[in-house]
């Protein structure tokens, strides 16, 4: 006889949320060298970029040293010269080039100039005031620009790292729990019909379920598929947004695509704060 799934009371959810919040505070306040590592890596990138582009002296920036900078993997640092920084996708669309891959830009001077032309138009005047007037920066301007740019890139890097770590940790906890129930992991595969994907007592991670990706897909004992979303947020407002705008939207799509009797959308609250 199948038992009914548990239904948590508001008080129980509030207690779990408080426990998770306490764990979150402990993790964030723990001593770590992550920030220093990201800052030093970013600083190294910008110092090398300044060296290759003659301290961003507009008159000294040539196709050759731009190509060399991209070849050295400094494309990200170049994007962060913009105020605000510009994404890979946006830069490619605005520059109207087929690719901004370093290997491509190194061999295509026209595309390279179009890409840097976009960056020049949106260069941050607060960090790089000398680029508007031409010439070299003062030592104070140079140091301020290096510091601000390194902090900007490092902050983005560590924010991305924290999001990925939280999601990965949550997925790991879900998969470990499934293993304790006797499930085994199967290779990820595109699931376009209800019979595809993991089979009896199996699950897969990062599977394409229809046209939407699911974090974990489980083949239940009754042959239905359970799609589990593992999303991490550290504020109640963002958690509600993620539930409504991400997990709920996917759930609606999967039910419409596969039917209410065939798929069980769910949301993991294992390690999120709320």
UniProtKB/Swiss-Prot annotation:
Signal peptide: none annotated. Keywords: Endonuclease, Hydrolase, Nuclease, Restriction system. GO terms for biological process: DNA restriction-modification system. InterPro entries: Restrct_endonuc_II_XamI (IPR019072). It is an enzyme of class 3 (hydrolase). Coiled coil: none annotated. The keyword Nuclease applies. It holds the Pfam family RE_XamI. Its EC number is 3.1.21.4. It comes from the Bacteria. It catalyses: Endonucleolytic cleavage of DNA to give specific double-stranded fragments with terminal 5'-phosphates. GO terms for molecular function: DNA binding; type II site-specific deoxyribonuclease activity. This is Type II restriction enzyme XamI. It comes from Xanthomonas campestris pv. amaranthicola.
């Amino acid at each position: 006889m199948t038992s009914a799934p548990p239904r948590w009371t508001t008080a129980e959810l509030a207690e779990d949320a408080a426990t998770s919040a306490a764990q979150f505070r402990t993790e964030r306040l723990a001593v770590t060298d992550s920030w220093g590592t990201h800052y030093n890596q970013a600083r190294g990138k910008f110092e090398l970029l300044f060296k290759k582009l003659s301290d961003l002296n507009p008159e000294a920036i040539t196709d050759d040293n731009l190509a060399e900078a991209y070849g050295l993997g400094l494309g990200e640092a170049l994007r962060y010269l913009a105020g605000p920084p510009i994404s890979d996708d946006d830069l490619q669309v605005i520059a109207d080039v087929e690719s901004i891959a370093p290997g491509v830009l190194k061999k295509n001077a026209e595309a390279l100039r179009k890409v840097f032309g976009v960056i020049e138009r949106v260069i941050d005047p607060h960090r790089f005031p000398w680029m508007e007037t031409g010439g070299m920066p003062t030592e104070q301007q140079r140091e301020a620009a290096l510091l601000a740019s390194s902090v900007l890139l490092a902050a983005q890097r560590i924010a991305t790292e924290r999001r990925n770590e939280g999601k990965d940790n949550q997925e790991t906890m879900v998969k470990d729990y499934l293993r304790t129930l006797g499930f085994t992991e199967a290779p990820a595969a595109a699931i376009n019909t209800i019979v595809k994907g993991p089979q009896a007592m199996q699950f897969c991670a990062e599977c394409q379920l229809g046209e939407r990706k699911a974090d974990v897909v489980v083949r239940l004992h009754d042959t239905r598929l359970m799609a589990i979303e593992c999303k991490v947020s550290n504020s109640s407002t963002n958690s509600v947004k993620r539930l409504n705008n991400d997990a709920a939207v996917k759930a609606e799509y999967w039910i419409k695509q596969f039917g209410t009797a065939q798929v069980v959308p769910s949301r993991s609250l294992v390690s999120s704060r709320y």
